Amino acid sequence: MPRKAYTKQQEVLPDPIYNSKLVSRLINKLMLDGKRGTASSILYKAFDRIQSETGNDPVEVFQQAMENVMPVLEVKARRVGGSNYQVPIEVRPERRTTLGLRWIVQYARLRSERTMEERLSKEIMDAANGTGASVKKRDDTHKMAEANRAFAHYRW
């Protein structure tokens, strides 16, 4: 038990253009060295690109992408009798969104397109269509949990 009281998690304010907390959290994940202006500019340009290419509302496309990327199960290492077991556990809702955002940004950065706006928009569109590296990461995480299902009774 910690000696100090837990600090309350800071509330994320919705972004000014789309009025969405999820978009605001994506801006925070994109941000490097505290440059929020640069991060939001990249995101809004990526959303404009999504709007022009798909003709749909970019926030809806992004929410669909998040649904396809967020994991339901993951594995956690648990030491029992001198050996480590990968124990499958359910992912809490807050962690699901955090992992989804993290994977979308991480795999967008690894893409080969020229600009970050292009990489991010393509990754979001791919994720919304059920393809892309971030969706593959979710599938791999689920496969890992399924493969270690035998150790589910070690859950704590």
Curated annotation (Swiss-Prot):
Transmembrane helix keyword on record: no
**Which residue windows are coiled coil?**
none
InterPro entries recorded = Ribosomal_uS7 (IPR000235), Ribosomal_uS7_bac/org-type (IPR005717), Ribosomal_uS7_CS (IPR020606), Ribosomal_uS7_dom (IPR023798), Ribosomal_uS7_dom_sf (IPR036823)
Q: Which Pfam families match?
A: Ribosomal_S7
What GO molecular-function term can you cite, just one?
A: tRNA binding
PROSITE patterns referenced in this protein's UniProt entry, alphabetically: RIBOSOMAL_S7
State whether keyword tRNA-binding applies.
yes
Q: Which UniProt keywords apply?
A: Ribonucleoprotein, Ribosomal protein, RNA-binding, rRNA-binding, tRNA-binding
Which GO biological process annotations does it have?
translation
Q: Tell me which SUPFAM superfamilies the record gives.
A: Ribosomal protein S7
Top-level taxonomic group = Bacteria
| UniProt cross-references to Gene3D superfamilies, sorted A to Z | Ribosomal protein S7 domain
Show the GO cellular component annotation of the record.
Answer: small ribosomal subunit
Q: Which NCBIfam families does UniProt cross-reference here?
A: rpsG_bact
Complexes and interactors: Part of the 30S ribosomal subunit. Contacts proteins S9 and S11.
Q: What does this protein's UniProt record list under function?
A: One of the primary rRNA binding proteins, it binds directly to 16S rRNA where it nucleates assembly of the head domain of the 30S subunit. Is located at the subunit interface close to the decoding center, probably blocks exit of the E-site tRNA.
Stored HAMAP family: Ribosomal_uS7_B (MF_00480_B)
**Family (UniProt):** Belongs to the universal ribosomal protein uS7 family.
According to UniProt, the name of this protein is: Small ribosomal subunit protein uS7
